Amino acid sequence: MNYLFKNGRYMNEEGKIVATDLLVQDGKIAKVAENITADNAEVIDVNGKLIAPGLVDVHVHLREPGGEHKETIETGTLAAAKGGFTTICAMPNTRPVPDCREHMEDLQNRIKEKAHVNVLPYGAITVRQAGSEMTDFETLKELGAFAFTDDGVGVQDASMMLAAMKRAAKLNMAVVAHCEENTLINKGCVHEGKFSEKHGLNGIPSVCESVHIARDILLAEAADCHYHVCHVSTKGSVRVIRDAKRAGIKVTAEVTPHHLVLCEDDIPSADPNFKMNPPLRGKEDHAALIEGLLDGTIDMIATDHAPHTAEEKAQGIERAPFGITGFETAFPLLYTNLVKKGIITLEQLIQFLTEKPADTFGLEAGRLKEGRTADITIIDLEQEEEIDPTTFLSKGKNTPFAGWKCQGWPVMTIVGGKIAWQKESALV
């Protein structure tokens, strides 16, 4: 099916929001201009809505295989499509881990069979993510690994991390890191700060993250490797990443929507839906994340979509697993709480969710260019809705944002020229 989207707005190559039509033919973007006419195309009047590149998320957890009670590739990618994401990168903390040919081939077959959006799987750095034996990077790359990570755990052995970075550099691949120094975790369930002290909970200190990042940055410099930092959360982490970039070290970084919108002061009680890793930090950390995003220290926004069952989250904040869902709330949360409040511009938000992650990892995504695959998201910036977890397509309903009123909701997502998800009656 060919589509002609009429009367929309998009961000042009100069970074300005302008009026446009957009023609999709044979799965490709055929033309982006005003007043397009075309035969043999279904006309969809978007009536002033934003025509954006499909959103790109480099940090997601789809749970399959091994955790299908939390999420599946089918439910997770449907949720991604509903959130406007057309390309997502799946972390390897599944069971089994994609750490060898057999496991990666099985995962790729599942993706091919079940995914509603583009899914790029990470390969594990170490076998079973156990930290002691390196995987076969060459084989995993051959089978389509997006990059290498042991996300969910930090690689504790510096010699292992250095060897991994050297091998990844030879393959022109990135090493992506969840940064925690295990000896500093302190059996914590929240940030070590006012909230942990008030509620008598073990806290995870900020330095647990930043000291690990500092170590890895020096290793990346020695290996001449692209090193990407997951879900930055502390002022100290922002500082060391900024210093590394100024020194010319190949480091990039991401931040989550929840760390941009919340800090520990916003946790109303010992509610497990506010338990994520890294935890919500202090006000100074939150301010540093915003500053880092604006000055280029932090390159992109990634959801760290981490679904869990209601039963798992009901165990209490000390026993419940870390993580919140992110696909279906990311854009409206960020648009409402950052763009509408004048903290960043709409153009910047689009870049942080599209071209910045795509360019960082060399993906042909993130821009509406003629000849490119038609991965597109239509967003109604005027639509206001209350976040209702019962309507999520994800199996995970674990969110701290239930009841929040937000503007800027995706209403249609196109993947490879086909409609992957559409809000009922939104574009009739």
UniProtKB/Swiss-Prot annotation:
Reactions listed under catalytic activity: (S)-dihydroorotate + H2O = N-carbamoyl-L-aspartate + H(+)
Keyword Zinc attached: yes
InterPro entries xrefs: Amidohydro-rel, DHOase, DHOase/Allantoinase_Hydrolase, Dihydroorotase_CS, Metal-dep_hydrolase_composite, Metal_Hydrolase
Binding site for Zn(2+) 2: D151, H178, H231
Keyword flag Hydrolase: yes
Cofactors required: Zn(2+)
Gene Ontology molecular-function annotations: allantoinase activity; dihydroorotase activity; zinc ion binding
Coiled coil ranges: none
Co-factor note (free text): Binds 2 Zn(2+) ions per subunit.
Keywords: Hydrolase, Metal-binding, Pyrimidine biosynthesis, Zinc
Active-site residue numbers: D304
Gene Ontology biological process terms in this record: 'de novo' UMP biosynthetic process; purine nucleobase catabolic process
Binding site for substrate: H61, L62, R63, N93, N277, H308, F322, G323
E.C. numbers: 3.5.2.3
Binding-site residues for Zn(2+) 1, renumbered to this chain: H59, H61, D151, D304
A GO term from the CC aspect: cytoplasm
Pathway info: Pyrimidine metabolism; UMP biosynthesis via de novo pathway; (S)-dihydroorotate from bicarbonate: step 3/3
PANTHER family: ALLANTOINASE (PTHR43668:SF2)
Function noted in UniProt: Catalyzes the reversible cyclization of carbamoyl aspartate to dihydroorotate.
Family: Belongs to the metallo-dependent hydrolases superfamily. DHOase family. Class I DHOase subfamily.
Protein name: Dihydroorotase
Naturally occurring in which organism (per UniProt): Bacillus thuringiensis (strain Al Hakam)
